């Protein structure tokens, strides 16, 4: 019986990998930084602050939202984006644990 790769790794490791993929692009890091400074933004706010097209910003927002790092709330004809602070704290905690374990393995 074949074992799927996802089954070989724990849920926390899968989430850390998903987080890593989500922040692996400089545009996504920029979006997260903008949202940290200005809590609620619509896509157009981000387009005005980044050297990217609306379609590209939308794609990056989709990736961040799929990972759970940001929340999108519908308001009239727009979506308002903000950081998901609960998920960010979880990722921070898991990342710190991972880094600590890597440093202690000499």
PLM regions and their residue ranges:
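Amphipathic alpha-helical dimerization/coiled-coil segments
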Residues: 1-16, 36-37, 85-106
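N-terminal helix-turn-helix DNA-binding core of bacterial DNA-binding proteins
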Residues: 14-53, 75-87
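Residues within the DNA-recognition helix of helix-turn-helix
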Residues: 60
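Alpha-helical residues within the helix-turn-helix
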Residues: 48, 65-66
């Amino acid at each position: 019986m074949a074992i799927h790769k996802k089954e070989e790794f724990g849920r926390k490791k899968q989430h850390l990998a998903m987080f890593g993929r989500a922040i692996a692009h400089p545009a996504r890091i920029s979006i997260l930084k903008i949202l940290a400074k200005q809590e609620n933004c619509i896509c157009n706010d981000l387009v005005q602050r980044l050297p990217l097209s609306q379609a590209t910003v939308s794609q990056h927002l989709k990736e961040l939202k799929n990972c759970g790092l940001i929340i999108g709330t519908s308001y009239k004809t727009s979506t308002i984006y903000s950081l998901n602070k609960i998920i960010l704290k979880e990722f921070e905690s898991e990342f710190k644990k991972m880094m600590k374990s890597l440093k202690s393995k000499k």
